[in-house]
Structure formats: structure tokens, C-alpha cells
């Protein structure tokens, strides 16, 4: 898990049930609890966001209805689901040209299956909401429930009740039903149950309810919730040689799609490490010694996600309580109890190291009834297991290979896992009873649908056009020996190397000269500069040798240590703006691979200096394509970096790039408004005219942020365009690009379940009726399942046909110059990602504006 997905998962597990000791007012650390107290009864997401259709309920009514699920256990509700906010965003109805149809026509038809199952309900199914009154009033919620459900014969077995609002799958005989109950001490209580709302199956509250119900089903199947997803601890994959365990599981969501309410279910894996946090701390202390241990421990542990197996909950480590040990006490009810005794009495666990310090996890969610959070959770390292992988583990080829053997599923394996889930749902009696009482069921097969495979593109290079194998989506062989569109001659460039790498530096230089000729690149011999293998020496060598007229700097690094790489990029991107290429010596140390590596390096160097490699046919004239992405920089005070890349020419081979650091709380588009104006001025300078059509691909939009893009970012983009002249009104399209999705598609090719071919478009069945959206499978993968990309056109006054929008989007996936093949997203999105990542990871400052016209970040 990376990026935004990781950010979403950090923090206490979304589905944690109350664990003793119970909820109390906020406490100081002296009285902090060893495990989280009762989580908040958070509000239903998606409330009031959907614009009411004619006859639909008001926002006020939605708020009232939503309150009815407040007391369903938060574990069942699955935590705060931001994707429900997005389901209330209606954009298609504002675009006249796609109101009737948003489907394309190009390409050849292909039969597909998708990881979706239809939710079926009995005819005329509805969810009925009732308000419940007690006379005399009853304070205890538990007592109110007990008194009400003395009348199960009248109400039925299926019900959800929060103490005031009742939901039933069946309509009671009368709009107002009066019931009489009796407390244990003989007090008579009159209960009035009044019908207040009848909710259709596709209402937002019903959709929320289906998801709650499905989480209940997963628990009946003995699956454990960790974070937002459910995993099976009874069927783990153990990798003992690396001390790792994998729990298989599923990520699920139920939403309204084009013509059906469907469950989307995809395979998920939770990687657990066999070592506890205490084991890790012991090992770290041995490595760094007592004096450096506190600092090193804080650096290594804070921010990590851990799992406590005694309750299968995940927590984010926010701090370390160096003055707390298991012998400290906290208040449980009216008595003081030590952490040590608490774990013994509550879980039967013995703490072996009484001197271990405690971990702190802040509970940010509000307490019941909107009260402040219940205070930090204090965790015992001995019972906390590390999750996920360290950077060192990710860099270990053997670990990643062994992990992939369990987690990188083929299309056949992935479909098989999902089919097994369907089978388990249909075979389990308890699950069927739960569904039947609510009048619901799931279709017992995956959804079948039709897609289209777009025609493959012809690659234009050196005055020629050629085709490539559409199944591999790669043209590295086809472009060999062909001159590039435009080449920058290398007359003044430097190569830095250490004494140990002198031989590989010479080999690289000779091979670069050999491969550059056929491409059309004129390359003079580089000035060779030796530096000592120290960061200060490297920086000094750069400062002394890189001049204003230097065209390119190549640095051969002895290892992939980040500090040396960062040093090079900071100096050459900020202080002394010069295109640069870093190469790790190991990459060029194998003679048999040197020609291939040198070819890729030569291509990158040419791009970074302003050269153009290849193109595809773009029929639209006076078109500017813009890509926007962002990155969260933890080193720069948790500021976000916004990157914008805009095309300057017809062939989409020249780009203007700008990166800005946002202030905390500032919207990305506020920071990038000036960048868009700069791009338009650069386009005007390059073409002697402004673009008549602008298409913005906005990547990096997380769940729940769609409304902000529509309400705030689109008007800001339009305002920014207006600064070029009040009479300047280009046609504008804004497309939200989403990679982190759980939708998967399977084709049957030569009788086998396989990935859909590159260029597969899906724009029916699994798209959303309120959006102008589509999926494209653009790239090919050699192993595992290919992941589609979701495109949601949130604003479009261009009148461009859906077919043209889809084909243009696919064409742009061919234009990323760091890969001789098709990539998963349009090139400007990938460029923006690379730029934001470079600034967030290495530079931490805005790059020098002299580099704006170059792809220096490739």
C-alpha cells in the first residue's frame, strides 16, 4: 500500500469495536488506556451530499434518516467510507452531449467478466424508517431496545435500532403502532412506533445499509476486520524464511451502478511480520547503542502501523511514552489497575519485560454523542506486531519474489478466489438466514458484460510510422535504428565517477557514443571528473565544474544511497539549473546488458535536454493537454507538492512543467493557478496563439474529494484561463483519473481466463449513472492481473463525443518518454507524478524556473 492509500490506513483501525476499559472522558497519559475505548458513533458518510431528484427526500430528511444507523457497531459500519461522499456528486446531468448516451463506438467487441455481483431483492423491496417514543421516557438505550423487542412477533426478526429510530424491511400494518411492555420491576411502558420514511433500494441510506449488512456477513464467515477490509486469519500464508505471514482477504463495496445495485469485491492481502515491536526494539538497541536508541527508535517506529493480535486491531504509532512501563496504572471504572494486571485479567496474557516502554496511538475520532476523543491508546510493544514492509525489505529481491508468489494472482486465480467467496456466501446457512430475513440475496455468478478493444496506434518517429504488437504494448524493438523526432547535440557535458567506478564509467561513455549515432544524437566526448565517495566531495565537484554552458551532467553513484542522489538533484534542480542523469554503478556493471541500459540512458538524456522521441496521431488542433498530480512531503513539514505539466505542441512531445509547494490547508489548485497561467503563456510563445481547447487530467483525487474538484477546482481553472483575456473562452474538459480502484476485468482468450488486451474500454454496466465515466485497460502486464484506470469527466463544455474522449485518453497513454510502451495513465499525469515525487522525495523546494521547458525529472 502506498501514497494516499497508506495515508488513509494510518490511524486506528476503522472498524474497531469497544474494548475494555470503556469510554471515559479525555484522560491524561497517566490515566491512559491500554487499548482504545469505545470508538465514536460517527455519522453516516454520504449524508446530504446527493442532490435530490424530483420527489426525492430533502437534505434535512437525509440527516434524520442517517441518524438511524448511528448505533450499529462501528465494526459493522466499516468506519467512515469517503467513497460514499462521491456517490452524491451528480455531474453528467450538467453535460448536454452525454445526457442520453456516454458510450463510445470504436473498436472490436470483447466479452468480459467483472468482479461484480448483483444484489437481488424481493419485488417492491424497501427499507422502512420508524420513530419510536416511550411513555414514560426511558433513559437507558439498552432498556429501550429490550422493551421494544419484546414485540418481535409484531416487528419481525430483522431490525436495526439505535434507541430512537428503527429500520425494518417490512411495513407494519398501521402507520402508527402502539405497543405495551413491562420492565423487570413491573413498570408499564407504552411504546409508539410511527412510520416516518419509506426508502427505495437505491437511496443513499439503503446503500449504506447494504454495506453494513455485508460486513456482518463477512464476520459470520469468520473473517476479521483490519482497517477497512476483512481478512481470514484461519487461512494464512506463512513465509518463515523472512518471518512474514500473509492474511488473505477482500475489499468490498456495494453501490448503485448503471442498471443494478452491485457488490464489487476484490482480493486483498495483509502482510504481517512475525516479530513484535519489542523484538524490533531489542534489535535496534543492539545496533545503535543506548545513547542513540531513543532517537533511532522514534525515527523508525513513529508512523508505522501495528497489529494487536489479542483483538485483531490496527493502530498507528504516534509517539513513544518513555516514562511509562506496564507497571504504570490507569483508571478502570472506579479502581486503579496496572497495564500488566489488566492484560492478565482481560486477555490472559503475561508481560515478560516489565521495563519496556509503552507506545502511544492517538484516537482522533470523536467520542459518543460528539464528546471529545477518549484519549490516547497505550500499547504494549510485546503484544504489537509490525505490519507491512520496510524500504529495506522492499529492496530485497528474494523477499519480494516470495511475497509475489502468494499475492500476485493470475486472472484465473483472482477470479477463483472471488468465486469461492460467492460460493461461501451461498452455502453458509447463517449467512442465508441473515440475508433472507432482510429479503435480500446475491447473484451466484460474476457479472458478464461487453467491452471494446480500441484500434492500436501507429507510432510516429523520424518521419516514419510503425506498428507494434498490440498484446505486448511495447515498441522498444521496433524503434531500434530509427532516428528520433528531434535530437539535442551533446557538445558540453560532464560525467562524474568515483575511482572504484572508473572502468564502468569508461564503458558507459563508449557505449553511449555507439548507441547515440543511429538515434540521430551527436555526442562529443564528455569531460570526465573523479570525485571521492563522500557527499561533500560530490557536491564540491559539482560546484567547481558545472558551468552555465553545461548541457548535461551524468553522475555515476557507487550505491543507491538516497542522500547522494538527493544532493545531486537539489543542486542541479534548484541552485544551478542543469539537466542531470544519475546512474547506479551496479546498473551498468553487466557488459551483456550495457547496450540496452545505455540506449535507455541516451533516450532519457535527450528528453531532459528538450529532445522529442516519438509521437502518435492527434487529430484535434490547437489542443493543450494538462496533467495535475500531488505528493505529500513529510520532510517539508507535511506540506503537499502540486505538480502541473502542460503540452506545448500538436504532437504532445514538448511539455511545460511546474511544481509548487502548498501551505498546510491550502487547496492544490490555489497553488497551481499561476502555473496554469505560465503554461498558457508558454503555449502562446511556442505557437503564436492560445489553445482553443484545454483538457485537464486531474490525478491524485482521493475518496471523498470529488465534490471539491467540481465545486472549487473547476471554477478556479476557469478563472485562471480568464486572466489571459476576458474574450478568451477555450473549450474546457476536466477529467478525474483514478488508479486505486478495486474493479477488475477478465477476458476468455483461447479458452483460458486472461487479462483483457491493452486498449480495452468499459463504459457500460459497471459505470455510474450520475457520472460521465469509463474504464480503460491501457497497459500489458507479464505477471498477475492488469489493473484498469477509471476516468470521470466532471466538467466538459467541449461537445467532444465520448468515443473521441476515450480514444484521445488512450493515445496519451502512449506518450510517456520514460517507457517505450503504453502506460497506465495519460502521459501528462505520469509526468506530473514524477515531478511531484522528485520534489517531495529529494528536493523539498520549488525547482528553478529555467528548467520549466524540460522533462528534467524523468
Swiss-Prot record:
Ranges for domain Piwi: 552-844
Gene Ontology terms for molecular function: metal ion binding; piRNA binding; RNA endonuclease activity
Location relative to the cell: Cytoplasm
Site (Required for binding 2'-O-methylated 3'-end of piRNAs): residue numbering on this chain: 378
Residue numbers annotated as active site: 629, 667, 699, 833
Annotated region described as Required for binding 2'-O-methylated 3'-end of piRNAs, given as residue ranges: 314-316
Hydrolase as UniProt keyword: yes
GO biological process terms on file: anatomical structure morphogenesis; gamete generation; germ cell development; meiotic cell cycle; piRNA processing; regulation of cytoplasmic translation; regulatory ncRNA-mediated gene silencing; sperm DNA condensation
Consequence recorded when altering residue 687 to K: In hu2410; induces germ cells apoptosis
One Pfam family hit: PAZ
Post-translational modification (record): Methylated on arginine residues; required for the interaction with Tudor domain-containing protein and subsequent localization to the meiotic nuage, also named P granule.
One annotated Gene Ontology cellular component of this protein: cytoplasm
Deletion phenotype: Progressive loss of germ cells due to apoptosis during larval development.
Chain ranges of the PAZ domain: 276-388
Family: Belongs to the argonaute family. Piwi subfamily.
Protein name listed in UniProt: Piwi-like protein 1
Organismal lineage: Eukaryota, Metazoa, Chordata, Craniata, Vertebrata
Protein encoded by which gene: piwil1
Amino acid at each position: 500500500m502506498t501514497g494516499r492509500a497508506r495515508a488513509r490506513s494510518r490511524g486506528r483501525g476503522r472498524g474497531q469495536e469497544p474494548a475494555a476499559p470503556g469510554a471515559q472522558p479525555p484522560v491524561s497519559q497517566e490515566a491512559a488506556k491500554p487499548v482504545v475505548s469505545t470508538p465514536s458513533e460517527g455519522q453516516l458518510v454520504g449524508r446530504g451530499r446527493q442532490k435530490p431528484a424530483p420527489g426525492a427526500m430533502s437534505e434535512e430528511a437525509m440527516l434524520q434518516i442517517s441518524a438511524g444507523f448511528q448505533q450499529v457497531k462501528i465494526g459493522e459500519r466499516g468506519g467512515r467510507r469517503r467513497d460514499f461522499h462521491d456517490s452524491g456528486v451528480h455531474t453528467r446531468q450538467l453535460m448536454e452531449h452525454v445526457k442520453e448516451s456516454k458510450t463510445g463506438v470504436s473498436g472490436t467487441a470483447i466479452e468480459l467478466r467483472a468482479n461484480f455481483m448483483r444484489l437481488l431483492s424481493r419485488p417492491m423491496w424497501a427499507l422502512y424508517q420508524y420513530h419510536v417514543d416511550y411513555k414514560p421516557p426511558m433513559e437507558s438505550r439498552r432498556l429501550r431496545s429490550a422493551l421494544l423487542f419484546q414485540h418481535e412477533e409484531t416487528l419481525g426478526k430483522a431490525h436495526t435500532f439505535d434507541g430512537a429510530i428503527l429500520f425494518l424491511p417490512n411495513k407494519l400494518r398501521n402507520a402508527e403502532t402502539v405497543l405495551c411492555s413491562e420492565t423487570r420491576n413491573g413498570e408499564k411502558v407504552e411504546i409508539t412506533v410511527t412510520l416516518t420514511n419509506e426508502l427505495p433500494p437505491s437511496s443513499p441510506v439503503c446503500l449504506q445499509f447494504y454495506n453494513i449488512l455485508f460486513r456482518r456477513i463477512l464476520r459470520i464467515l469468520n473473517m476479521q476486520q483490519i482497517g477497512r477490509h476483512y481478512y481470514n486469519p484461519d487461512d494464512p500464508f506463512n513465509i518463515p524464511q523472512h518471518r512474514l505471514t500473509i492474511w488473505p482477504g477482500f475489499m468490498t463495496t456495494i453501490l448503485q451502478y448503471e442498471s443494478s445495485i452491485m457488490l464489487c469485491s476484490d482480493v486483498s492481502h495483509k502482510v504481517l511480520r512475525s516479530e513484535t515491536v519489542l523484538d524490533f526494539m531489542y534489535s535496534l538497541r543492539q545496533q545503535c547503542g543506548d545513547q542513540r536508541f531513543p532517537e533511532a527508535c522514534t525515527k523508525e517506529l513513529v508512523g508505522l502501523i501495528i497489529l494487536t493480535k489479542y483483538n485483531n486491531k490496527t493502530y498507528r504509532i504516534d509517539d513513544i511514552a518513555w516514562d511509562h512501563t506496564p507497571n504504570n496504572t490507569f483508571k478502570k471504572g472506579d479502581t486503579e489497575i496496572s497495564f500488566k494486571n489488566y492484560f492478565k485479567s482481560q486477555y490472559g496474557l503475561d508481560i515478560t519485560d516489565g521495563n519496556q516502554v509503552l507506545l502511544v496511538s492517538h484516537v482522533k475520532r470523536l467520542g459518543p454523542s460528539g464528546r471529545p476523543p477518549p484519549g490516547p491508546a497505550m500499547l504494549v510493544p510485546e503484544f504489537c506486531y509490525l505490519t507491512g514492509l520496510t524500504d529495506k525489505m522492499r529492496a530485497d529481491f528474494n523477499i519480494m519474489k516470495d511475497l509475489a508468489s502468494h499475492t500476485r494472482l493470475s486472472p484465473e486465480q483472482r477470479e477463483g478466489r472471488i468465486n469461492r467467496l460467492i460460493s461461501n456466501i451461498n452455502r453458509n446457512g447463517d449467512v442465508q438466514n441473515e440475508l433472507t430475513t432482510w429479503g435480500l440475496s446475491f447473484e451466484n455468478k460474476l457479472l458478464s458484460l461487453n467491452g471494446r478493444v480500441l484500434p492500436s496506434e501507429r507510432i510516429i518517429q523520424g518521419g516514419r510510422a510503425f506498428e507494434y504488437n498490440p498484446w505486448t504494448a511495447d515498441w522498444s524493438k521496433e524503434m531500434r535504428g530509427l532516428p528520433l523526432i528531434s535530437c539535442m547535440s551533446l557538445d558540453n557535458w560532464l560525467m562524474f565517477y568515483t575511482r572504484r567506478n572508473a572502468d564502468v564509467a569508461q564503458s558507459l561513455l563508449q557505449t553511449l557514443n555507439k548507441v547515440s549515432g543511429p538515434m540521430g544524437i551527436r555526442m562529443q566526448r564528455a569531460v570526465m571528473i573523479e570525485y571521492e565517495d563522500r557527499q561533500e566531495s560530490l557536491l564540491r565537484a559539482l560546484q567547481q565544474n558545472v558551468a552555465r554552458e553545461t548541457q548535461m551532467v551524468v553522475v555515476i553513484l557507487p550505491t543507491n544511497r538516497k542522500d547522494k542522489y538527493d544532493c545531486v538533484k537539489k543542486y542541479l534542480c534548484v541552485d544551478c539549473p542543469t539537466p542531470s542523469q544519475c546512474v547506479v554503478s551496479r546498473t551498468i556493471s553487466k557488459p551483456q546488458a550495457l547496450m540496452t541500459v545505455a540506449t535507455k540512458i541516451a533516450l532519457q538524456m535527450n528528453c531532459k535536454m528538450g529532445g522529442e522521441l516519438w509521437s502518435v496521431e492527434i487529430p484535434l488542433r490547437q489542443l493543450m493537454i494538462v496533467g495535475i498530480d500531488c505528493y505529500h512531503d513529510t520532510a517539508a513539514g507535511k506540506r503537499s507538492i502540486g505538480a502541473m505539466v502542460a503540452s506545448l505542441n500538436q504532437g504532445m512531445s514538448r511539455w511545460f512543467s511546474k511544481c509548487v509547494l502548498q501551505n498546510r490547508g491550502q487547496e492544490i489548485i490555489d497553488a497551481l493557478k499561476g502555473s496554469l497561467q505560465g503554461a498558457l503563456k508558454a503555449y502562446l510563445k511556442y505557437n503564436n496563439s492560445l489553445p482553443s481547447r484545454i483538457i485537464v487530467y486531474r490525478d491524485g483525487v482521493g475518496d471523498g474529494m470529488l465534490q471539491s474538484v467540481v465545486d472549487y477546482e473547476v471554477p478556479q481553472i476557469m478563472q485562471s484561463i480568464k486572466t489571459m483575456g476576458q474574450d478568451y473562452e477555450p473549450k474546457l474538459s476536466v477529467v478525474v483519473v483514478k488508479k486505486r480502484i478495486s474493479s477488475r476485468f477478465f477476458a476468455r482468450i483461447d479458452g483460458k481466463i486472461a487479462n483483457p488486451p491493452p486498449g480495452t474500454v468499459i463504459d457500460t454496466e459497471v459505470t455510474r449513472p450520475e457520472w460521465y465515466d469509463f474504464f480503460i485497460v491501457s497497459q500489458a502486464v507479464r505477471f498477475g492481473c492488469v489493473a484498469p484506470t477509471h476516468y470521470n469527466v466532471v466538467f466538459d463544455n467541449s461537445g467532444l463525443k465520448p468515443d473521441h474522449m476515450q480514444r484521445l485518453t488512450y493515445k496519451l497513454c502512449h506518450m510517456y518518454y520514460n517507457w517505450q510502451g503504453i502506460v497506465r495513465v495519460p502521459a501528462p499525469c505520469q509526468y506530473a507524478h514524477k515531478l511531484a515525487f522528485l520534489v517531495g522525495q529529494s528536493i523539498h523546494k520549488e525547482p528553478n524556473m529555467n528548467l520549466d521547458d524540460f522533462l528534467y525529472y524523468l
